[in-house]
Amino acid sequence: MRLPDPYTNPEYPGLGFESVNLVDNDPMIRDELPNGKVKEVKISAQYWGINISYPELFPDEYAFLDSRLLEYKRTGDYLDVLLPQYEAFRVRGDTKSVTIPAGQKGSQIILNTNGTLTGQPKAGDLFKLSTHPKVYKITNFSSSGNVWNISLYPDLFITTTGSEKPVFNGILFRTKLMNGDSFGSTLNNNGTYSGISLSLRESL
């Protein structure tokens, strides 16, 4: 289910985030060797953490957010989160007509736009494949005609089959709420609610 925000519920403007922190978690063991080198060994897959703080909410805004979070906990679903700072809409067009060759893996992906896309992504933009929930960041971009070469972090979690389509806009992080067992707020003497924050972890 989608975490409510002003895009989904414009009648509740307070659901816009006061601050949001996207954290790159890349679990790794580092060992300092006698020759001065540092050996790195990955111990788990990379995942994104998201920390969200809300401004003071009016009672109807708080009640709506609280009910959505309780519904998430009741159903055991995922929370899909959109981060507005990444909604640049630099790439537009018909992504359904884009082809992604099969057999690709690693940290780069090649796609053929077939002339259906306008604009170009930039380093730091988000990227996703239509068939898998993992979110990537673009680290480099180059093109030759209709062929785009996109460098990604982290490495692709899947090997492409040729059925995937690229996603550049409206990218949702699929997450689990990590502080749901102690979620709370403070009712102020002016009738607003404060101290509301969410700690989320990408979950595939």
Curated annotation (Swiss-Prot):
Domains (record comment): Possesses OB-fold domains probably serving host adhesion properties.
Keywords: Late protein, Viral tail protein, Virion
UniProt xrefs under Pfam families: DTP-pb9_A-dom_C, DTP-pb9_A-dom_N, DTP-pb9_B-dom
Function according to Swiss-Prot or TrEMBL: Forms the simplified baseplate, together with the p132 collar protein, the baseplate tube protein p140 and baseplate hub protein pb3.
Compartment list: Virion
Protein name: Distal tail protein pb9
Organism, scientific name: Escherichia phage T5 (Enterobacteria phage T5)
Lineage: Viruses, Duplodnaviria, Heunggongvirae, Uroviricota, Caudoviricetes
Matches recorded under InterPro entries: DTP-pb9_A-dom_C, DTP-pb9_A-dom_N, DTP-pb9_B-dom
UniProt GO cellular component terms: virus tail; virus tail, baseplate
Superkingdom of this protein's organism: Viruses
Subunit structure as annotated in this protein's UniProt entry: Homohexamer. Interacts with baseplate tube protein p140 and baseplate hub protein pb3.
